[in-house]
């Protein structure tokens, strides 16, 4: 299949030229290009057009889950008939294994896996192996090891009508693929009923596979509704993919066990004069080997990944990037933040594992269960488009002059010129500006502070004045961060104060004021790049305004003013030449995801959007009702609850 772009609008402004240049660059095998696009200029739409033009498997890399979720939703709308997939960390909670030598404290790995995201990850790898019209939106999880595509593909099970498959052997093979025999219809399971085997793929929630046999001959394959098992399609063949990225063929597993034992013997000699470490490593590793022999799996199996892939020590791990063909297109969104993040991943992982290996908790091969280094990741940059309003030196150097500007916004809204006010008395002045905007409906304010403490103090000060305010910084747990961002989008918060709000992807049309406190304190978050990015947060609103609270004009402020004026003039000239009046983006933040039906519901007043906690409760409620209805053979009713649960999960995924 080819990529089929669906949009209710055509490219305009700078977009047609940007699309043409980027497309031609890829066709001419230009390795690196930069799309320098202002906030609100439609960069995602431009990339979607390029993807449709070049028709290659595509990986879009975002620097956090929030941005990845936004991009995933947008690309799904642009390519409804293609495989748009989502690949991020599937941990709702993750405490990595660690050892603190100074106080002899071992911290065992603790985690909570999000089943829905696990399904999406498996769906992503299935799609990229099966079809070229695949676009995967990913966080930096794509550079972490997940098991080799060769092992994963070799464990896939191809079934054809008319061929013989002894059912006992088929069931055993499904177990090896990480499927469980269960009477309950849920993903990663299968069930046998007479001459029928129903399989519920690990990467699907809307489709089951029903196999019917005559003796051991496969007589039919039907795709079915997983609740009602009513057939939706009949096919001559199908492929069932494993329920985990870490499954391996038996021969590979046996070879890996031998290799692990050899490394263990070497390490026993290393610890000959350290009996505590020697005993600890021997018992831990021996237990893991026995688990792998018996079940094909053990806790922390990823630490032995090198033995399964037969790679030499220090070799890069197999990751999502290895699942793509060589001619894939890589799009790095917000590259000025994403590239530094890729650089940082390896160093953080290495420092944690050093003490685990040194004190006998892990074999040295655990070092190879890691993210790629930046240099290793670069080897996959065959055709890459860096996307940013403020690209860094790395991207500019790599692109060797292949820089495509996209300054003009389809909305006609020019960049707001930052107003500079004294830093002395900045909080009182800010309060007055906030009150002006809160007298208007639906307007939001972003405040950028210089420290976490100041963000907390301002939020407390505003809250005492009955202003709906909250602070956001790195000290807040992920779950709470998610809730705060959701409340901002849902309208429960009017003012958000933070130190680095750029990382949150807050491009809201409702933001009419961005205030940067202590803007003259030169540093990472007061650099030219950061200041321009902050200004862009107000460029989606016709009334958008930016205030720099500064007692002096720093070099970064001067460069920001110069670049902002340049971009503003380009937009104004375009508006004048094309008789365009700036207009705001009309976009609903969130709608109630639960389908409404029936006379009674239609007469109820419109419900306010649901919070994350409310959605989680609702999902659990619908899941229980669905299972209860299915157990009582009320399949039509169960299907309705299934659809409601799916809609709620999609909304929760977007909020998260």
Curated annotation (Swiss-Prot):
UVR domain location: 616-651
CDD domains linked: DEXHc_UvrB, SF2_C_UvrB
UniProt cross-references to SUPFAM superfamilies, sorted A to Z: C-terminal UvrC-binding domain of UvrB, P-loop containing nucleoside triphosphate hydrolases
Residues annotated as binding ATP: 37-44
The keyword DNA repair belongs to this UniProt entry's keyword annotation: yes
UniProt keywords, alphabetically: ATP-binding, Cytoplasm, DNA damage, DNA excision, DNA repair, Excision nuclease, Nucleotide-binding, SOS response
Subcellular locations according to the entry: Cytoplasm
UniProt subunit comment: Forms a heterotetramer with UvrA during the search for lesions. Interacts with UvrC in an incision complex.
Role this protein plays: The UvrABC repair system catalyzes the recognition and processing of DNA lesions. A damage recognition complex composed of 2 UvrA and 2 UvrB subunits scans DNA for abnormalities. Upon binding of the UvrA(2)B(2) complex to a putative damaged site, the DNA wraps around one UvrB monomer. DNA wrap is dependent on ATP binding by UvrB and probably causes local melting of the DNA helix, facilitating insertion of UvrB beta-hairpin between the DNA strands. Then UvrB probes one DNA strand for the presence of a lesion.
Record-given protein name: UvrABC system protein B
Gene: uvrB
């Amino acid at each position: 299949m080819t990529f089929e772009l669906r949009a209710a609008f055509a490219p305009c402004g700078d977009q047609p030229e940007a699309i043409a240049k980027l497309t031609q660059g890829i066709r001419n095998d230009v390795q690196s290009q930069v799309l320098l696009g202002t906030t609100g200029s439609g960069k995602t739409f431009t990339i979607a057009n390029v993807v449709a033009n070049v028709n290659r498997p595509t990986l879009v890399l975002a620097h956090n889950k929030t941005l990845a979720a936004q991009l995933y939703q947008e690309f799904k709308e642009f390519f409804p008939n293609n495989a748009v997939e989502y690949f991020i960390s599937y941990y709702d909670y993750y405490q990595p294994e660690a050892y603190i030598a100074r106080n002899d404290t071992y911290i065992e790995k603790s985690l909570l896996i999000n089943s829905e995201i696990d399904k999406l990850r498996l769906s992503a790898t299935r799609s990229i192996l099966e079809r070229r019209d695949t676009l995967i939106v990913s966080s930096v999880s794509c550079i972490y090891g997940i098991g080799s595509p060769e092992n994963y593909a070799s464990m896939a099970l191809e079934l054809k009508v008319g061929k013989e498959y002894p059912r006992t052997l088929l069931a055993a093979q499904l177990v090896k693929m990480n499927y469980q025999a269960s009477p309950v219809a849920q993903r990663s399971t299968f069930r046998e009923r007479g001459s029928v085997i129903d399989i519920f793929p690990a990467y699907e929630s809307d489709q089951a596979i029903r196999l019917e046999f005559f003796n051991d001959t496969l007589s039919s394959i039907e795709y079915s509704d997983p609740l009602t098992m009513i057939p939706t399609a009949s096919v001559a063949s199908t492929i069932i993919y494993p329920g985990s990225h870490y499954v391996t063929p038996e021969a590979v597993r046996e070879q890996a066990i031998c290799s692990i034992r050899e490394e263990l013997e070497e390490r026993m000699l290393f610890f000959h004069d350290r009996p505590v470490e020697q005993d600890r490593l021997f018992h831990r590793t021996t237990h893991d080997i026995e688990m792998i022999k018996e079940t094909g799996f053990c806790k922390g199996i990823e630490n032995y990944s090198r033995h399964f892939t037969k790679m030499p020590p220090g070799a890069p791990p197999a990751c999502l990037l290895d699942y793509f063909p060589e001619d894939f297109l890589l799009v790095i969104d917000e590259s000025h933040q994403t590239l530094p993040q890729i650089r940082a991943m390896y160093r953080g992982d290495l420092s944690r594992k050093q003490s685990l290996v040194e004190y006998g908790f892990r074999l040295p091969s655990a070092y190879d269960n890691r993210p790629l280094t930046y240099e290793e990741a670069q080897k996959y940059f065959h055709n890459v488009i860096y996307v940013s309003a403020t690209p860094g030196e790395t991207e500019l150097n790599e692109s060797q002059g292949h820089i495509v500007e996209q300054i003009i916004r389809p909305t006609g809204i020019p960049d707001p010129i930052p107003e500079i006010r004294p830093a002395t008395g900045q909080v009182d002045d800010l309060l007055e500006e906030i009150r002006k905007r809160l007298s208007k409906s639906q307007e939001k304010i972003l405040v950028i502070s210089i420290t976490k403490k100041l963000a907390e103090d301002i939020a407390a000060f505003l809250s005492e004045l009955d202003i709906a305010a909250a602070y956001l910084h790195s000290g807040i747990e992920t779950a709470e961060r998610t809730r705060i961002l959701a409340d901002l989008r849902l309208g429960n918060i009017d003012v958000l104060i933070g130190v680095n709000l750029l990382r949150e992807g807050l491009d809201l049309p409702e933001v009419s004021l961005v205030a940067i406190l202590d803007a003259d304190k030169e540093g990472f978050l007061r650099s030219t790049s950061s200041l321009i990015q902050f200004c862009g947060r107000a460029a989606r609103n016709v009334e958008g305004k930016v205030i720099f609270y500064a007692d002096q004009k720093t070099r970064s402020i001067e460069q920001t003013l110069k670049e902002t004026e340049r971009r503003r003039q380009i937009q104004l000239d375009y508006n004048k030449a094309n008789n365009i009046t700036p207009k705001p983006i009309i976009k609903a933040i969130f709608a109630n995801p639960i389908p409404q039906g029936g006379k009674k519901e239609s007469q109820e007043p419109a419900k306010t959007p649901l919070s994350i906690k409310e959605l989680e409760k609702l999902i659990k409620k619908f899941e229980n009702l669905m299972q209860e209805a299915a157990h009582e053979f009320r399949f039509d009713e169960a299907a309705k609850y299934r659809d409601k649960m799916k809609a709620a999960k999609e909304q929760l995924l977007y909020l998260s």
